[in-house]
Amino acid sequence: MTKSAPPPPKPAPSGRSASADKASPRATVPDAQALSITTGVASAAQRIVIYGTGGIGKSTLAAYLPGALFIDLEQGSLSLPVARDATTTSWKELRGKLAALVASPPDGVRSVVIDTATVAEELAKEHVIATRTTEKGQRVESIEGFGWGKGWQFVYEEFTGLLADLDRLVALGLNVCLLAHEVDTPVPNPAGEDFLRWEPHLYAGDKKRRGSIRDRVKNWADHVLFLAYDVHVKDGKGQGSGTRSIYTTELPTHIAKSRTASLVLDFDLFDAAAIWHHLNIITP
């Protein structure tokens, strides 16, 4: 007895195949969630970056943040009447102390200042060299020993972890502030001659700024404040006046930004405590 051939499969709906129907799980509709709508300006902790040349007053300005606690990596706060931890000498210690602050913020601490992010990056680099190996499992003696760009990618990952630690503090209602040194950086200009611009002294990435810790920090921050000495031009020559300004908006000469202000402040006209109010930086 000859068996008859099985009937052909039923045609799938237009635009779909029978096999796709079997393979594709049924889409689920998420449960409805009620919105929690608020209006007006919300009081929230802030992410702040202050950068400028050594000795210009970065630590002094940060010291007037409410309830400031310095994690002092280069003894920049020793002459200031602030709470500080000046014993951190490694990346592991720095991350561990931030974890302790997240777990149990000390009474009275409302702002955490890392002095400086430039030194913190060096600690991260030392940590990567000491703990990571190449793809062949070999130890290296310098960040370049990992191969082109690979070592700095590890440092970028470590520093991103530090920013995540600081985000946890912000979620608890604490302001966080990174101080940094300055560096002049060549900026390509397709419309004319290239020029130099002041930026925070952090790793800038490759030629296309991929893997840039500097750009990552800028994008992360609510405020990037540039402190600089004023220069006046007389008879075609620049002359320093000894006065200082705080820049909150970006210009060809520097990077800066603020979510709440767009002005230039005379650092010597106001006391440091009043500057935070003039910048409209909301502190919980």
Question: What label would you give each PLM region?
Answer:
Residues T2-K3, P284:
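Acidic, gly/ser/pro-rich intrinsically disordered tails
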Residues K3-I37:
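N-terminal pre-Walker A segment at the start of P-loop NTPase domains
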Residues Q33, T38-T131:
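Conserved P-loop
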Residues T60-A62, R168, R216-V217:
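Hydrophobic/aromatic ligand-binding patch that stacks against planar heteroaromatic rings
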Residues A68-F70, V176, V224-F226:
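Short, well-ordered beta-strand core segments
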Residues A100-S104, L123, L169, W220, ...:
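Conserved, well-folded catalytic cores of nucleic-acid-processing
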Residues V119-I213:
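P-loop NTPase motor core
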Residues T185-P284:
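Conserved GTP-binding G-domain of TRAFAC-class P-loop NTPases and closely related GTPase folds
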